[in-house]
Amino acid sequence: LSGSILLNTLGGLYVDAERFNKMSTAEAIEYIDSHYYEYIEYDARKTDETFKDASKAEKAIYIVEDFKAYYMSDGICAYFCNDGDTFASDLTSSMREIGLNDAADTIDDFIEKNNIDYSRYIEANEETEENKYPYAAIDNKLASTFDSQCNETIAKYAKSHANELQYIMK
């Protein structure tokens, strides 16, 4: 592939937008996952300060990648119950921005039906929170809406906004 590759400040490789856009979906997702997970771990504060210079696309991908990491490891409760999440109130709008509308609808319906307030950081006891709501049911429903669409949708969105992704592009 043509285009430049640079070493980022965290020790990983950066590619430019031209090279990124030539990647297959699988390659793009592997690149996105490794760079965002690295960034998420590096900037574990997860506050609005994290995004002070970020584009709308950067923030949306970061939030969905953060959710994906929790969800794929232990289900949706891992995201919402593990001390809450600073950006939980932005999750479904970020999903919609990227194009994961069915998953966003599923989560919004779950929150509404269970009268859950994730608009602030929750100091939660994971075990207590997990037993309050039917998380297994939403995990099953998300398996058909999020799991099947997330990687392709994230890759497509990232490619169409590659020039705005300052944290993973150079």
Question: Residue ranges of each PLM-predicted region?
Answer:
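Extended, alpha-helix-rich binding/interface surfaces that flank or overlap catalytic cores
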Residues: 10-88, 94-170
